């Protein structure tokens, strides 16, 4: 975290998290960004970036068909608008959160700040590991014709234990040199001019606020690096050694494939032009016209010129089996069902019931992640509601939030067959089936059904019998 020391000194506070946690998070973020510490040009060890795959898949499943609905009043409509503006950021935010273990969503008066652990320092927490004091660092740069100005803001959130007030303190600085805090300046001279230097807040009825004015996402697994830490662990922190083994196995397999080219070693006497004296043979002599896989060698004698074909045998099947074992073990330790990640695709039809049975561990893991995401969104919406009161952004009113997620075991063909049975049995209207599975509007589906029914009622050639 840039200016960590200066930010803590500004408010005379100390971090409650250890340096070890900073190291763990940095190590994991390097793996996520395809820069794991085990990369080696000397030993030809590369990475397939599977740490990102784990985060990406977790975020994809957890945000599948996510819907956040806020109802109840004009205030609720305003809150809904704020969430809808960021709808397509949910998956991205969650992927980064899985990589870093923690993220914070905080209203800033004009929008929403997304913050990873390198942008904040936790300075207080309760016995349950909930954040009760935190310092945020924010920066931006202004470029002029001859120079640049670097602006920094330290923002301190905490509760006053004596009065129950929620306190926010903002301190701003400007420097003409990158990497320096610079001199203090009034907040009105920065882009944060809409904020106040010091704010104290309680509810309109004078009661203390119920929670901090931001949402916190923390991965669901317990932190075994720092017990009762307010920070979560990256989802793959427990499999770094296995990720290293996976990269080594992949690199060895790729190296073997690269070196598997067919080679023919042929005596240079066999490649000499007709009529050229044998006495002109020389060691290291280049012979033009040979294919790229043929190499001339010097050493044959008389009527026994040297010739040998080398066709390296690949151990691909064995190596793929080993890679799949690593993948399965990695997935299981992260929270996925055994065999969820494999190189070879699954074949055959799988019903939703089978998927639910086979992937029960995956389903539970994703549910846990969704629960944590819901709690984070609840915190964000609560903070937006308080800011709306503070700055008069929307009319006062009640709101209620509901969350809906897609079923990760959903099978469209199975659902189609079930709905068609409903239609045949008279339990559902046919137009609903066509709307749901054929992409028709309600009007189009009803018109098609009416047309078909009309054709069936037309009289035959000899009239109605």
For the regions a language model picked out, list residue spans one by one.
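Activation/maturation switch segments at domain boundaries
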Residues: 417-465
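Extended, helix-rich architectural segments
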Residues: 1-145, 464-465
